[in-house]
Amino acid sequence: MNLLFDFTVDKAAKTVFITREFDADLSLVWDAFTTAEILDQWVAPKPWTSKTKFMDFKVGGRRFYAMVSPEGQERWAIQKYTSISPKTNFKMFNAFADKDENPELPGSDWDYTFSEQNGKTIVHITIYNESLARMEKMIEMGFTEGFKMSMNNLENLLAGLWKK
């Protein structure tokens, strides 16, 4: 089955637009993006893994986590939730950080919107970067390929969790 996956970089707007369709129930897809135990199973591009130190999914709450390489190298990030409309939309500020939770600015604003159509869930993600240099560095470091791998990890995980 071919599921929609669109990934567009708009350098002039310092924004990345992503649309991804999943063959799963909206509530399950929502949980996959908002629950640490599920996020850690798919969000890191293989062979890296994700390790959440803490996550408080509420407005003003934060998620502090690391992407861990097979050699044990950790790349920390912090996310602060700025808006949540359950099972519809959430927004967060994302920045790399050190292991002591000190953010490395500039960061980026992420806006996730969830909808259901014909039994499938569509996730629209808009990533606005505070600086073009940050966005270019993010892409240069392999963000596009890594994010696509993560979305495929999620698709495979959902296939195992969601039986129609």
Predicted regions mapped to residue ranges:
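Hydrophobic ligand-binding cavity/cleft-lining segments
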Residues: 1-49
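Beta-strand/loop substructures that line and gate deep hydrophobic ligand-binding cavities in soluble
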Residues: 15, 93, 99-145
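Short beta-edge strand/loop motif at the mouth of beta-sheet-based domains
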Residues: 17-18, 37-74
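Hydrophobic/aromatic beta-strand elements that line small-molecule binding cavities or substrate pockets
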Residues: 20, 52-53, 77-83, 108-115
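A short, structured loop/turn motif at beta-sheet edges
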Residues: 26-27, 56-58, 82-89, 113-122
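Hydrophobic pocket/interface hotspot
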Residues: 29, 39, 63, 81, ...
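Helix-adjacent hinge/juxtasegments
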Residues: 62-93
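Short, highly charged C-terminal tails/helix-capping segments
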Residues: 158-164
